[in-house]
From Swiss-Prot:
High-level lineage: Eukaryota, Fungi, Dikarya, Ascomycota, Saccharomycotina
Listed HAMAP family: Ribosomal_eL13
Function statement: Component of the ribosome, a large ribonucleoprotein complex responsible for the synthesis of proteins in the cell. The small ribosomal subunit (SSU) binds messenger RNAs (mRNAs) and translates the encoded message by selecting cognate aminoacyl-transfer RNA (tRNA) molecules. The large subunit (LSU) contains the ribosomal catalytic site termed the peptidyl transferase center (PTC), which catalyzes the formation of peptide bonds, thereby polymerizing the amino acids delivered by tRNAs into a polypeptide chain.
Cellular component, GO annotation: cytosol; cytosolic large ribosomal subunit
Residues the record lists as Phosphothreonine modifications: 144, 152
Record's keyword terms, sorted: Cytoplasm, Phosphoprotein, Ribonucleoprotein, Ribosomal protein
Designated name of the protein: Large ribosomal subunit protein eL13A
UniProt family annotation: Belongs to the eukaryotic ribosomal protein eL13 family.
Organism for this UniProt entry: Saccharomyces cerevisiae (strain ATCC 204508 / S288c) (Baker's yeast)
Misc note: Present with 133000 molecules/cell in log phase SD medium.
One Gene Ontology molecular-function label: RNA binding
Amino acid sequence: MAISKNLPILKNHFRKHWQERVKVHFDQAGKKVSRRNARATRAAKIAPRPLDLLRPVVRAPTVKYNRKVRAGRGFTLAEVKAAGLTAAYARTIGIAVDHRRQNRNQEIFDANVQRLKEYQSKIIVFPRNGKAPEAEQVLSAAATFPIAQPATDVEARAVQDNGESAFRTLRLARSEKKFRGIREKRAREKAEAEAEKKK
């Protein structure tokens, strides 16, 4: 919040010579260049391995953004298992695994299993040294597996106003889901009360 008017500064927990220790960000542009150079250096050092772990395709949360897909934190245990891997082994060959994520979408599940299988088909795994063959190092033939937005094929058609509102339909669907339990309970209690009256 900006300071306005000639009033005392509230909660002024300053110390002596605090002006000498103000944090400024005049190096923002320089830091950006430094980070870019560091990424390039690391990429050259670990080449031909990719910079980051393989991430899953996930659908963004909330009604506003759920039409888009993006990279997630890690593959679910079910996805890893369906691809014929174990979580511990997957982590050693450059695959991110997130034990907390749950699958609620069959399309995304299938896409991620396919992504894992494609990754497995393109990697070359060999022992890091002769003594410990279980410790692997990964060489990736294709370093990146980009996440593409699914194409939406929309055909041109005449505009029709049938009096239905997409917003209202979604709003009612959400409301119905939210209150389904309490409505069923009320209906059940009402039916029981009527049955009691008839007796």
